Amino acid sequence: MSAAESVDQLIERFNLAQGELVKGNAEPANELFSHREDVTLANPLGPTAHRWDEVAAAGEHAASQLRDGEMVGFEAIEKYITPELAYVLRVERAKAKVGEGEDIAPMALRVTMNFRPEEGTWKVVHRHADPITTPQPVESVIQE
């Protein structure tokens, strides 16, 4: 199987795993991450997780804040694949009950993921997700 086919297969598996995450189950997504020391996760709920134990815990925490959800769509922006490294930039859209809320709420995340082959299987080595999907004023970066 070519690198492009393998990465596309991993992305499809990750899409399905995200469907589980918005139902409160982090395990399928966590299985797709590298377990090596250089793996990272930067999600909207906290500081960057670095190393497998922190990444797994951050994924579990994110899943614990979501329930009764479903993925609505994935909007590909760019994808680049080499035999040794690949990345995808996209917008992920979902709806779920968030935190203590009882209403299903729409969510959108701008996501970058990096992948690499490890022992014959492609893995996620970095994921960054944030809720910025529309233009923002420069003042939005100010923290008081």
Where does each model-flagged region fall?
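A detector for short, charged/polar N-terminal pre-domain segments
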Residues: 2-6, 137
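A solvent-exposed, acidic/Ser-Thr-rich amphipathic alpha-helical stretch
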Residues: 7, 20, 26-82, 91, ...
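Amphipathic alpha-helical repeat scaffolds
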Residues: 11, 15-19
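A short, structured loop/turn motif at beta-sheet edges
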Residues: 79-87, 102, 115-123
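Generic short beta-strand segments
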Residues: 90-97
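A short, polar/proline- and glycine-enriched secondary-structure boundary/capping micro-motif
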Residues: 98-102, 134-140
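Short beta-strand edge/turn micro-motifs at domain boundaries
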Residues: 108-138
